[in-house]
Design a protein with these regions (language model features):
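Non-catalytic positions within long, well-ordered alpha-helices that form the structural scaffold/packing
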Residues: 33, 77, 112, 164-167
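Alpha/beta enzyme core
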Residues: 29-35, 108-121
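N-terminal positively charged helical leader segments and presequences
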Residues: 1-84, 88-95
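Alpha-helix-loop-beta-strand connector modules within alpha/beta enzyme cores
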Residues: 53-71, 90-105, 134-157
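Short acidic active-site motifs
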Residues: 26-27, 51, 106-110, 140, ...
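Glycine-rich beta-to-alpha transition loops that act as phosphate-gripper elements at the mouths
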Residues: 21-22, 72-76, 99-108, 124, ...
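Glycine-rich phosphate-binding active-site loops on the catalytic face of alpha/beta enzymes
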Residues: 84-94, 118-132, 155-178
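Conserved, mostly hydrophobic/aromatic
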Residues: 17, 40, 111, 119, ...
């Protein structure tokens, strides 16, 4: 079940696009198709700092023009992201929307203690970004999601069709949204 939002929490998007080296060329087109209120998690770990900052500025401009939030992963606070993304230890103390990664019930608990607004629980299904990783599968994913005190975003091998079958707050993808 999707967790209800409280007034204390930042609005958690229902659709989240994660950036990486593989989908970079298609990001502007993907942003143009996302509904207002969605989010882009900017990662781009593969770029040198100066190039990474320039790419962040360009994508932030494109996203904001469409009413899409921009969440930063391991970026300096001065870049102007709308929030932070990463493991519980990486989001603790961050500002704005806090999206934590989780792969287990213990990590969901750590995310809650770190002040996360939501968890991206993964990998739900097999994924190209982590070949060979053991997927949770729909049943185990839903068991973990039901025990989560936070809104859950499904990540890992996600498509619109798969997302429609999972009764959680939302879904995220790297390849499934480009």
């Amino acid at each position: 079940m999707a967790k209800r939002q409280t007034n204390k929490r930042a609005a958690v998007p229902r659709i989240i696009l994660l950036s990486d080296a593989r989908n970079d060329a298609a990001l502007e087109r993907a942003l143009a198709r996302l509904p207002r209120g969605s989010a882009l998690v900017f990662r781009h770990y593969h770029l040198p700092e100066a190039e990474r900052h320039m790419r962040f500025i360009a994508l932030k401009r494109a996203a904001r023009a469409r009413g899409i939030g921009v969440i930063g992963a391991r970026i300096p606070p001065g870049w102007g992201a709308d929030g932070v993304y990463g493991a519980a230890t990486e989001i603790a103390g961050g500002t704005g929307l806090k999206l934590a990664t989780a792969h287990s019930l213990a990590e969901i608990g750590a995310a809650r203690r770190a002040g996360a607004d939501a968890v991206l629980l993964s990998p739900v299904f097999a994924t190209r970004s982590h070949p060979g990783a053991t997927a949770l599968g729909a049943v185990r994913f839903l068991l973990l999601a039901r025990r989560s005190p936070l809104p859950v975003i499904a990540l890992g091998g996600m498509t619109l069709r798969r997302a429609a079958r999972l009764p959680v707050h939302g879904w995220a993808a790297i390849d499934g949204l480009v």
